[in-house]
C-alpha cells in the first residue's frame, strides 16, 4: 500500500530529520517549489510523494497510515539490530 502523507505529516517528517526544503529537494530530487506546494496542501503525482517518503525512510523515519491507528503520523523507526546492541 502506498503511503500518502498529509501536508502536516510531511512538514513533521522534515522537522524530525532537521532538513530545510532545499535539503529535502537535494536528497529526493523533487523541486523545492513542489515540496512547498505539498507542505501547503497542494496536490502532486503519486511518484513525487513516494520520492519524498523514500528519502525520509532512508533517514530512519516510518510513516503511520491513518488506517493503522486513530490518526496518521510519522515516527523514528528502530533500525534492525539496534535494540539487541543496546541490551548488551
Predicted regions mapped to residue ranges:
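Residues that mark the N-terminal boundary/hinge immediately upstream of a DNA-recognition element
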Residues: 6-9, 20, 45-48
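Helix-turn-helix/homeodomain-like alpha-helical modules used for DNA recognition
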Residues: 61-88
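Alpha-helical residues within the helix-turn-helix
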Residues: 15, 26, 40
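Conserved hydrophobic/aromatic packing and binding residues within compact polymer-binding modules
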Residues: 10, 24-25, 35-38
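DNA major-groove recognition helix of helix-turn-helix/homeodomain DNA-binding modules
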Residues: 46-64
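A detector for short, charged/polar N-terminal pre-domain segments
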Residues: 1-5
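Short basic helix-loop element that most often maps to the first helix and adjoining turn
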Residues: 9-23, 81-84
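Recognition helix of helix-turn-helix/homeodomain-like DNA-binding domains
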Residues: 29-44
